[in-house]
């Protein structure tokens, strides 16, 4: 059984999520201890427990230690289900997109539809629009497509969001994406939930003003939703290159001007673009698992502790001939 110290490196939930995914794909059981030991609230929280439960059900796994506050978990996967329609409810504003990341590789070329309820636009996790504008488009470039439907948005602290993942298809091949290439344009989504539409407009306008410094081809659409359980706003932007895609987002909050939200996302995007890496730092972390599975290489703008930790977890399950070169930007290559 693979033994994993959940406190090493970044020491957060990503260690558990990557372990769940790779354990299911390789059919290698694991024991993880010191789960989130470095966090203010150590152990499994509702969001992590939902990820465990989702993978448990999808893989017919045997699990010990799956309760709130648990700092040790033993996970023994079975066979991945071939078809079915499943619903997983976090019950809080915990991130639906982090659970999406965990289970997506398990759904590939299977007749599975998964609905996840919780937060869609919450701090310290990819927004649902980042998944739609950046993550899904990057996966298309390596041969994987999927549908992700945004049914309801969920902001912190109320949650109430809902997404549905289906039709995960593809024949991923070895890939090499090491340059961003010529900038083709910008796309984005500026949203409000149960708030005045002018907030989304102002977020959009302030972002456009900054992005025009590089290119006039900008397509930011508005997503205005009324009657949602949670109130909130945000904007997600992506820069489309000939080879790469760079994303950045920002969330609104009480007392924060809408113009500031748009400027924050746009300035983050321009900063990411300066390195000429194919992908942004968040995508650099998320793509590492796929590069390890399908022998890929890519560059990303900044090597984070998340990425370093993720690579070490991957090596626990897969015997990869991989290397990391540089830091800002960095190259990850698996041969």
Swiss-Prot record:
SUPFAM superfamilies recorded: EPT/RTPC-like
Active site: 306
Enzyme Commission number: 6.5.1.4
InterPro entries attached to this UniProt entry: RNA3'-term_phos_cycl_insert (IPR013791), RNA3'_phos_cyclase_dom (IPR023797), RNA3'_phos_cyclase_dom_sf (IPR037136), RNA3'_term_phos_cyc (IPR000228), RNA3'_term_phos_cyc_type_1 (IPR017770), RNA3'_term_phos_cycl-like_CS (IPR020719), RNA3'P_cycl/enolpyr_Trfase_a/b (IPR013792), RPTC_insert (IPR036553)
UniProt binding sites for ATP: 101, 282-285
Superkingdom in the source lineage: Archaea
Reaction(s) catalysed (UniProt annotation): a 3'-end 3'-phospho-ribonucleotide-RNA + ATP = a 3'-end 2',3'-cyclophospho-ribonucleotide-RNA + AMP + diphosphate
PANTHER family (UniProt xref): RNA 3' TERMINAL PHOSPHATE CYCLASE (PTHR11096), RNA 3'-TERMINAL PHOSPHATE CYCLASE (PTHR11096:SF0)
UniProt-recorded name of the protein: RNA 3'-terminal phosphate cyclase
The species this protein was found in: Sulfolobus acidocaldarius (strain ATCC 33909 / DSM 639 / JCM 8929 / NBRC 15157 / NCIMB 11770)
Classification of source organism: Archaea, Thermoproteota, Thermoprotei, Sulfolobales, Sulfolobaceae
């Amino acid at each position: 059984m693979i033994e994993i110290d959940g406190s090493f490196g970044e020491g957060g939930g990503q260690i558990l999520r990557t372990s769940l995914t790779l354990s299911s794909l390789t059919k290698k059981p694991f024991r993880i201890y010191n789960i989130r030991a470095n966090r203010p609230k150590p152990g499994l929280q509702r969001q992590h427990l939902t990820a465990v439960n989702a993978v448990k059900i999808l893989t017919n796994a045997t699990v010990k230690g799956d309760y709130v506050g648990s700092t040790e978990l033993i996970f023994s996967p079975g066979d991945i289900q071939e078809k079915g329609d499943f619903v997983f409810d976090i019950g809080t504003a915990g991130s639906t997109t982090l659970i999406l990341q965990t289970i997506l590789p398990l759904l590939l070329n299977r007749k599975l539809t998964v609905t996840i309820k919780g937060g869609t636009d919450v701090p310290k996790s990819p927004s649902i629009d980042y998944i739609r504008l950046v993550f899904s488009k990057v996966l298309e470039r390596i041969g994987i497509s999927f549908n992700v439907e945004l049914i309801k948005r969920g902001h912190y602290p109320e949650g109430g969001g809902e997404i549905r993942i289906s039709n995960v298809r593809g024949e991923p091949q070895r890939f090499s994406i090491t340059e961003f290439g010529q900038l083709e344009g910008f796309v984005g989504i500026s949203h409000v939930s149960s708030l005045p539409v002018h907030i989304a407009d102002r977020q959009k306008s302030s972002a456009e003003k900054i992005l025009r410094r590089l290119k006039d081809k900008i397509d930011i659409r508005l997503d205005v939703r009324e009657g949602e359980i949670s109130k909130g706003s945000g904007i997600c932007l992506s820069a489309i290159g000939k080879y790469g895609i760079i994303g950045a987002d920002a969330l609104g909050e009480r007392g924060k001007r809408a113009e500031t939200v748009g400027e924050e996302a746009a300035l983050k995007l321009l900063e990411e673009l300066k390195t000429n890496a194919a992908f942004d730092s968040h995508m650099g972390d998320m793509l590492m698992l796929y590069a390890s599975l399908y022998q890929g290489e890519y560059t990303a703008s900044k090597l984070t502790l998340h990425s370093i930790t993720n690579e070490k977890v991957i090596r626990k399950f897969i015997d990869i001939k991989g290397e990391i070169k540089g830091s800002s930007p960095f190259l990850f290559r698996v041969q």
